[in-house]
From Swiss-Prot:
<feature type="binding site">
    <location>
        <position position="67"/>
    </location>
    <ligand>
        <name>[4Fe-4S] cluster 1</name>
    </ligand>
</feature>
<comment type="function">
    <text>NDH-1 shuttles electrons from an unknown electron donor, via FMN and iron-sulfur (Fe-S) centers, to quinones in the respiratory and/or the photosynthetic chain. The immediate electron acceptor for the enzyme in this species is believed to be plastoquinone. Couples the redox reaction to proton translocation, and thus conserves the redox energy in a proton gradient.</text>
</comment>
<protein>
    <recommendedName>
        <fullName>NAD(P)H-quinone oxidoreductase subunit I</fullName>
        <ecNumber>7.1.1.-</ecNumber>
    </recommendedName>
</protein>
<dbReference type="InterPro" id="IPR010226">
    <property type="entry name" value="NADH_quinone_OxRdtase_chainI"/>
</dbReference>
<keyword id="KW-0004">4Fe-4S</keyword>
<feature type="binding site">
    <location>
        <position position="70"/>
    </location>
    <ligand>
        <name>[4Fe-4S] cluster 1</name>
    </ligand>
</feature>
<keyword id="KW-0618">Plastoquinone</keyword>
<comment type="similarity">
    <text>Belongs to the complex I 23 kDa subunit family.</text>
</comment>
<keyword id="KW-0408">Iron</keyword>
<dbReference type="GO" id="GO:0031676">
    <property type="term" value="C:plasma membrane-derived thylakoid membrane"/>
</dbReference>
<dbReference type="InterPro" id="IPR004497">
    <property type="entry name" value="NDHI"/>
</dbReference>
<keyword id="KW-1278">Translocase</keyword>
<dbReference type="GO" id="GO:0019684">
    <property type="term" value="P:photosynthesis, light reaction"/>
</dbReference>
<feature type="compositionally biased region" description="Basic and acidic residues">
    <location>
        <begin position="168"/>
        <end position="187"/>
    </location>
</feature>
<keyword id="KW-0472">Membrane</keyword>
<keyword id="KW-0874">Quinone</keyword>
<feature type="binding site">
    <location>
        <position position="107"/>
    </location>
    <ligand>
        <name>[4Fe-4S] cluster 2</name>
    </ligand>
</feature>
Length: 202
């Protein structure tokens, strides 16, 4: 009889320990269920790059004096500067300027040392292509104005992941009415239309 009672007591003890372990695991799960998802559903949601983000290089043809400082400071001598010497003006006439982003390491040396500030780093980071030759940007492609994430109505920009308030280290502490992960572009467009209609009524 005592042996049986001991077995029942041990079984009850083990059951309580198992229930406690399961409860702890479920507690962690439920805690995460209440939080806002941190996964960015790219390409429908995009992080806004930081202010000094080193993305695609923007080039202004009119400012360039063909000094080739960018070529000298580049670790891999990447920029290609084509120019001819004009004997009348005794200056260089720039013909073409190109950078191969397939080889560029985005170090920013060319931008930092450019004497006329004709080069600048943009926030654009989507340079993927099926053909590597398309990554060789000439002066026309480099002169194209950068595309901002915030200008695209089909994309939800996530500012709070890149710009958290001072002293704030937890991206979960954001308003619950912000668009959540998993929304499709058409849903976002409908949401924006409803918000615009509500603003017009007010």
């Amino acid at each position: 009889m005592l042996k049986f009672l001991k077995q029942v007591g041990d079984y009850a003890k083990e059951s309580l320990q198992a229930a406690k372990a399961i409860g702890q695991g479920l507690g962690v799960t439920f805690d995460h269920m209440q939080r806002r998802p941190v996964t960015v559903q790219y390409p429908y949601e995009k992080l806004i790059p930081s202010e000094r983000y080193r993305g695609r290089i923007h080039y202004e043809f009119d400012k360039c004096i063909a000094c080739e400082v960018c070529v000298r400071v580049c670790p891999i001598n990447l920029p290609v500067v084509d120019w001819v010497y004009n004997k009348e003006t005794k200056k260089k006439d720039l013909k073409n300027y190109s950078i191969d982003f397939g080889a560029c390491i985005f170090c920013g040396n060319c931008v930092e040392y450019c004497p006329t500030n004709c080069l600048s780093m943009t926030e654009e980071y989507e340079l993927a292509t099926y053909d590597r030759h398309e990554l060789n940007y000439d002066n026309v492609a480099l002169g194209r104005l950068p595309y901002k994430v915030t200008d695209d109505p089909m994309v939800t920009p996530f500012r709070e992941f890149a710009y958290l308030p001072k002293g704030e280290y937890d991206p979960h502490v954001v308003p619950s009415d912000r668009p959540r992960a998993g929304q499709r572009p058409e849903e976002l467009v409908d949401q924006y239309k409803q918000a615009a209609a509500a603003n017009e009524e007010n």
